[in-house]
């Protein structure tokens, strides 16, 4: 390869990446997921568009695995362990039982539609059986979904790849060897994938944490060290026949939930690297497909995609979540709809091509078509479906910016900046009147781009910018402090007519609003009553019905319900009650 060819490759690569970034700005205007736009750029530049011929499947496999490792590492770093209290076991059930059921249901229909053997149909089902972390992390961000739904979908997408990879590799081996029966050794293989992946991920994350916190480097090198360490964990786990995808996700989870040096620098750079990984991966996958090859299979492939979206995924979700009573029908419906397929199925579809199986090109084209339909149909309608099924909650007021204060190696101090608009209740109040959360301090006050030297008597005005020092766990309290109403920062349109304290006794609440206890313990706290009704770990937005009234979890303090909203039937509204 001469210098001219190398320069041409650099130019083409840079133009494609740049075009993807620029065109992605149309995503929000058109309501189309960014990943679809990037795929489209790759397809337009490919053999049926710009004429770039790319059919190197091993290279696509390499790029795809590298990109997914970076994306999963970034996803793990941003996942809060606290969310596991409501979603760990349901997500694992979806990642195992759900994938198995989806594979079986999809495989049977695929075999019938394309006149294949059952085992070939099941291979198609396995290839497209798992949700994609890149698609889920990208499309769920900023949608305001309740914690149970968000955590379940994110943990599922980060942990269901081992099952899909295991099923795909197993079925390829069976087809290649002519084997038609299953053996108990397959279960051992699956347990080994999960076991080694889990141990390597947790152990590798702990070792990386010790290394980052003990070694002194230039600030810009810590993110690179974390990425390198994540890739080491990923590759070593694969070499030991474990799940590298699960391992790198857990490695990020450990690093993201412990005090770590240069935390904000790591997260900031990983965000950019994850975006680059997504762009590069979907560009390569777009180049890899030949669009005119999709036309002959378009009708049956569309039928298979719709079967997955409307039947296979919902049935698998209902079955997998059957033991978990906390999930309402609306939440199950939304989780069913967000069975987003992305890069993983396309990468898994490369496996049969590399193994030289008959009909391997059909498997690849089918996987690509299903991914395209999934992103266009499910990804585009996600915000609308969230509103329809009422799984969103009002967002907490957030600072306009936040930055780290690295006063020591593992410092978790941050600087939060709040801009005070005309709707803020604290306008006209003196600083001494603000009940700041314990452990926080106002560090600076800017007014009309000028730094003031505030005192307790300084009165806040519209447009002021407050700089507050605190920790991440102070954000909910600070958000309420700088909300739109004095002690009514909660969105009453969502939570109800009144908001009650969670420790209010049920007997007092019933007497106040003329409700019947029906044998319930009058001394029972309202929070405990709602927890029992929910049937699992509650989250903000959970609702129950009692005597025609709707009771909504409004504020959580860890695992404890702190405030509850109550909405009465239309035309009825009791007295002031315990209005807060």
Swiss-Prot record:
Q: Which residues form the RCK C-terminal domain?
A: 402-484
Main location, first listed in the record? membrane
Q: Name one Pfam family in it.
A: CorC_HlyC
Gene3D superfamilies from the xrefs?
1.20.1530.20, 3.30.465.10, Regulator of K+ conductance, C-terminal domain
Instruction: Report which residue ranges the record marks as coiled coil.
Output: none
Q: Which GO terms describe its cellular component?
A: plasma membrane
Protein's UniProt keywords contain Nucleus? no
Recorded catalytic reaction(s): these are:
K(+)(in) + H(+)(out) = K(+)(out) + H(+)(in)
Give the InterPro entries listed for this entry: Cation/H_exchanger_TM, FAD-bd_PCMH-like_sf, FAD-bd_PCMH_sub2, Na+/solute_symporter_sf, NhaP2, RCK_C, RCK_C_sf, Transptr-assoc_dom
Highest taxon, organism lineage? Bacteria
* UniProt record similarity statement: Belongs to the monovalent cation:proton antiporter 1 (CPA1) transporter (TC 2.A.36) family. NhaP2 subfamily.
Q: Which protein is depicted?
A: K(+)/H(+) antiporter NhaP2
Tell me the lineage of the source organism.
Bacteria, Pseudomonadati, Pseudomonadota, Gammaproteobacteria, Pseudomonadales
Q: Which gene encodes it?
A: nhaP2
């Amino acid at each position: 390869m001469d210098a001219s060819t190398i320069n041409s490759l650099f130019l083409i690569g840079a133009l494609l990446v740049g075009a993807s970034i620029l065109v992605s700005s149309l995503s929000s205007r058109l309501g189309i997921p960014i990943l679809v736009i990037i795929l489209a750029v790759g397809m337009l530049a490919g053999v049926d568009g710009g004429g770039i011929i790319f059919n190197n499947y091993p290279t696509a496999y390499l790029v795809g695995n590298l990109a997914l490792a970076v994306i999963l590492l970034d996803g793990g770093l941003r996942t809060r362990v606290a969310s596991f209290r409501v979603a760990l076991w349901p997500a694992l059930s979806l990642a195992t039982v759900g994938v198995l059921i989806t594979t079986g249901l999809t495989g049977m229909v695929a075999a019938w539609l394309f006149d294949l053997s059952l085992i070939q149909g099941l291979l198609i089902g396995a290839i497209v059986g798992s949700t994609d972390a890149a698609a889920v992390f990208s499309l769920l961000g900023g949608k305001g979904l309740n914690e149970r739904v968000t955590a379940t979908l994110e943990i599922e997408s980060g942990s269901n790849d081992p099952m899909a990879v295991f099923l795909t590799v197993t079925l390829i081996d069976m087809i290649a060897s002519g084997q038609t029966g299953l053996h108990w050794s397959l279960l051992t293989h699956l347990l080994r994938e999960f076991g080694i992946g889990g141990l390597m991920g947790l152990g590798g994350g702990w070792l990386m944490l010790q290394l980052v916190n003990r070694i002194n480097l230039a600030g810009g090198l810590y993110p690179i060290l974390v990425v390198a360490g994540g890739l080491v964990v990923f590759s070593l786990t694969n070499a030991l026949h474990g799940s590298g995808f699960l391992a790198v996700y857990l490695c990020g989870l450990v690093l993201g939930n412990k005090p770590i040096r240069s935390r904000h620098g790591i997260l900031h750079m990983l965000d950019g690297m994850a975006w680059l990984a997504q762009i590069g991966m979907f560009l390569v996958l777009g180049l890899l497909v030949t669009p005119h090859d999709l036309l002959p299979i378009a009708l049956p492939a569309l039928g298979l995609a719709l079967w997955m979206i409307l039947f296979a995924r919902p049935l698998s979700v209902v079955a997998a979540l059957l033991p978990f009573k906390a999930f309402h029908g609306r939440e199950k419906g939304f989780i069913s709809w967000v069975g987003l397929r992305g890069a993983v199925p396309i990468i898994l579809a490369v496996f049969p091509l590399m193994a030289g199986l008959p009909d391997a090109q059909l498997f690849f084209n089918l996987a690509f078509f299903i991914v395209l339909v999934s992103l266009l149909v499910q990804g585009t309608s996600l915000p609308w479906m969230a509103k329809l099924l009422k799984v969103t909650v009002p967002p907490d007021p957030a600072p306009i910016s936040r930055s780290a204060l690295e006063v020591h190696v593992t410092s978790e101090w941050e600087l939060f900046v709040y801009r005070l608009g005309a709707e803020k209740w604290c306008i006209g109040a003196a600083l001494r009147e603000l009940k700041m959360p314990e452990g926080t301090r106002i560090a600076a006050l800017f007014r009309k781009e000028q730094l003031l030297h505030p005192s307790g008597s300084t009165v806040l005005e519209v447009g002021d910018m407050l700089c507050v020092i605190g920790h991440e766990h102070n954000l909910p309290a600070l958000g309420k402090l700088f909300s739109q109403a004095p002690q009514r920062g909660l969105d009453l349109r969502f939570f109800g007519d009144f908001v009650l304290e969670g420790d209010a006794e049920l007997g007092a609440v019933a007497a106040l609003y003329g409700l019947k206890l029906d044998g319930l313990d009058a001394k029972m706290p309202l929070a405990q009553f709602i927890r029992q009704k929910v049937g699992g770990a509650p989250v903000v937005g959970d609702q129950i019905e009692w005597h025609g009234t709707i009771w909504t979890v409004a504020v959580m303090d860890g695992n404890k319900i702190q405030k509850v909203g109550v909405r009465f039937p239309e035309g009825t509204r009791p007295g002031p009650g315990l209005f807060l």
